[in-house]
C-alpha cells in the first residue's frame, strides 16, 4: 500500500489522491508492454514498434540476467542514480542516516525478518539500503538480490523452473554477477525499467512502445517554467489561435498542478510548502524529480545539459 501521508492517502485517484491505486504497477505499466500504445493516454508521442534494431525490446534483452534470462547484463545503473530515489515516506535517501539506523552487523535482511515480513520487498541476505524505498525504485532498479519474474520461462523445456528467481551481482558469482566472461554489470546495479514480468530471452520479450514524449514530462516542464518567472511579475500569453490570453505568474497552486500529479501516481508524498516557496530549492527538487521519473528515457540527459546549473543530483 502507498505511504500513509494524510494527504494523498486520504483520497481516491479521482479525488486527487492515491488510496485506491497501486503506484508500483501504475508506473511500470507505462513502459513494460502491459499497455499497447493506443491504450496508454500518457504517451503524447511514440514511434510505437517502428524502432528497428534499436528497439526497447532489444534493450530489455540486454538488461536480462545472463543465466536465468538469457540476457547480457549489459546496462548498469550508477550508484548516484540508485541513491536518487526517495524513501517511501518522501525523505531523501541518506547513507549516513542508514548507517546510524542499522549498525554494523544488522545491515542485511535475516531469515527471521523475512518470516516476520519486516521488509516485504526484500529477500534474505539483501542489503537494507534497498528497503522502504519509493515504488518507482522497485519498478526501475535491479538491485543486488532482487527477484526477476521471468514468467515465460515456465513455457520452456530447459528453463521451466527458472521463474521468480533471486539474482545476485556481487563478486565471485559466476552466473549473473562478476565473472571472467566479460558479461556482468560493471556497477553491480542493473535496470528493471521496461521489463515485464513475462519477459525472458529464453522465450519472448513483450513489444514496448517508446515513450518519446509523455504527459509527465509536460507537467515537469510546466512546473519548471513557472518556477523561473520573476516574483511579482505577471505575463499575458496569447492562446494558439489568438482568441484569448492567459495570465501567467509564479503561482504555487499552479506549480502543484504539475508536481502533485506526478508524485501521487508515484505513490510519494508531495513537497513541503517551504520547498515550493524557495525558487532554488524547488529547482533542485524538480531536477531530482525529472532524474527519477524519466530515468532511462530520452529527455533526461538533454534536459540536464541545458539547465542553468551544474549541480546535478
Spans of features found by a protein language model:
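Structured C-terminal helix/loop/strand segments within mature extracytoplasmic catalytic/sensor domains
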Residues: 85
Amino acid at each position: 500500500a502507498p505511504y500513509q501521508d494524510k494527504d494523498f492517502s486520504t483520497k481516491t485517484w479521482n479525488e486527487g489522491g492515491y488510496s485506491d491505486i497501486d503506484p508500483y504497477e501504475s508506473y511500470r505499466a507505462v513502459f513494460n508492454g502491459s499497455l499497447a500504445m493506443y491504450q496508454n493516454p500518457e504517451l503524447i508521442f511514440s514511434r510505437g514498434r517502428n524502432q528497428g534494431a534499436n528497439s526497447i525490446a532489444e534493450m530489455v534483452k540486454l538488461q536480462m540476467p545472463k543465466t536465468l534470462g538469457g540476457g547480457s547484463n549489459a546496462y548498469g545503473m550508477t550508484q548516484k542514480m540508485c541513491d536518487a530515489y526517495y524513501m517511501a515516506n518522501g525523505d531523501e535517501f541518506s547513507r549516513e542516516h542508514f548507517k546510524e539506523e542499522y549498525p554494523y552487523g544488522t545491515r542485511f535482511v535475516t531469515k527471521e525478518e523475512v518470516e516476520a515480513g519486516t521488509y516485504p520487498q526484500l529477500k534474505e541476505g539483501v542489503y537494507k539500503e534497498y528497503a522502504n524505498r519509493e515504488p518507482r525504485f522497485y519498478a526501475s532498479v535491479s538491485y543486488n538480490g532482487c527477484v526477476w519474474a521471468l514468467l515465460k520461462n515456465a513455457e520452456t523445456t530447459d528453463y521451466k523452473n527458472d521463474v521468480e528467481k533471486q539474482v545476485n551481482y556481487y563478486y565471485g558469482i559466476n552466473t549473473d554477477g562478476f565473472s571472467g566472461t566479460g558479461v556482468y554489470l560493471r556497477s553491480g546495479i542493473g535496470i528493471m525499467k521496461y521489463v515485464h514480468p513475462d519477459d525472458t530471452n529464453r522465450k519472448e520479450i513483450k513489444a514496448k512502445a517508446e515513450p518519446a514524449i509523455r504527459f509527465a514530462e509536460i507537467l515537469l516542464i510546466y512546473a519548471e517554467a513557472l518556477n523561473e518567472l520573476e516574483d511579482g511579475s505577471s505575463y499575458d500569453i496569447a492562446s494558439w489561435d489568438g482568441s484569448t490570453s492567459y495570465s501567467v505568474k509564479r503561482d504555487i497552486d499552479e506549480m502543484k498542478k504539475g508536481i502533485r500529479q506526478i508524485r501521487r501516481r508515484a505513490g510519494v508524498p508531495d513537497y513541503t510548502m517551504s520547498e515550493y516557496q524557495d525558487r532554488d530549492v524547488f529547482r533542485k527538487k524538480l531536477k531530482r524529480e525529472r532524474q527519477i521519473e524519466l530515468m532511462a528515457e530520452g529527455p533526461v540527459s538533454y534536459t540536464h545539459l541545458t539547465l542553468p546549473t551544474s549541480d546535478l543530483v
